[in-house]
């Protein structure tokens, strides 16, 4: 079974009310499975499953947490959005290095396994001050203008 679906099913045991949005990309099978899983969700949990979207930044802007893998692009987007993260299943190598850095800097948490995922989500949702600290830390570390800064440096243009 796909690790994303395992995580979504694990979230069914959350205790706090929540809306969970699963962005399934172009994975039609995952989309179907999540929709099927959502039919059995407890009343306090609302599940949505969406196919590929170009509006990821809008979904991040209205979210309290991001749950997913620590790939480079994902981390760039979550940091630019100051969206606290719960990191799952990093691939050995670059994703493990990314996860280690983000965790050490206090911008994310990582459950020991998928079974503890609902506990971590409930814990963070119960502690808005902790989420605020994580968001602030992300704002301090993020460099959303990094590409412009590199280009300006290469071209010898004074920073904007």
Named regions from a protein language model:
Residues 82, 97-107:
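Acidic, glycine-centered active-site loop in nucleotide-sugar glycosyltransferases
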Residues 130-144:
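A short, well-ordered alpha-helix in the C-terminal region of glycosyltransferases
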Residues 143-160:
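C-terminal alpha-helical cap of glycosyltransferases
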